[in-house]
Amino acid sequence: MKRTLTTGAATLLAMLALGVTAVQAKTLVYCSEGSPENFTPALNTTGTTFDAARPVYNQLVEFARGTTTVVPGLAEKWEVSADGKTITFNLRKGVKWHSGVNNFKPTRDFNADDVLFSFNRQWKEDHPYHKISGGKYDYFADMEMPTLLESLEKKDDYTVVMKLKEANAPIMANLSMDFGTIQSAEYADMLLKA
């Protein structure tokens, strides 16, 4: 018995010693059943793209893990008008953007500009990023967002007002889906200038 305890203690000490020598990873390694087409769920409707992008991006609202219950995401709260046609999103403060890709160094946190960028690129034909996919955003269109949206406005840096042409019962669940991923407008602006 004493020998077993001694061996166990030695093993535990060795494991602890190995743990303190951890090295900062330089590359993210992700295992998937296939290669994603890209990391922009707005452009694709495949599981490999969604699976690769989900750990990287968030939506305004999201599904609670393993359910279809809508919970706060990048919007910490929201209010739906009595007629169901206006949704006011209060955005989470202090959310940081990723850096390093194409030497991008964000100068600001997530805000309403990113929400407008992410939806308008799919919705507005005159948006500079709309044509990237040939103007086709199948998921966005399949959720009938182009015909449902009346306007999307920035009230202030942390408030976005979405107006619908008519009330839509599943709108919050729909916004939890992958096409609703929010991306950095600042990063997109940097790419346009490159």
Model-based region annotation:
Residues E33-P36, N44, R65-G66, D83-K85, ...:
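Solvent-exposed coil/turn segments that connect beta secondary-structure elements
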Residues M1-A10:
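Bacterial N-terminal signal peptides that target proteins for export
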Residues D109, D114-L116, W123-K193:
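Surface-exposed binding/hinge segments that line
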Residues T11-L12, V23:
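Cleavable N-terminal signal peptides
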Residues E76-Y129, V161:
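Aromatic- and charge-enriched surface segment that lines or borders ligand/interaction sites
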Residues A42-G47, K96-P106, L148-E150:
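Second-shell loop/turn segments in exported
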Residues C31-A82, N120, H127:
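N-terminal lobe/hinge region of extracytoplasmic solute-binding protein
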Residues L18-A25:
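Sec/Tat signal peptide C-region and signal peptidase I cleavage site
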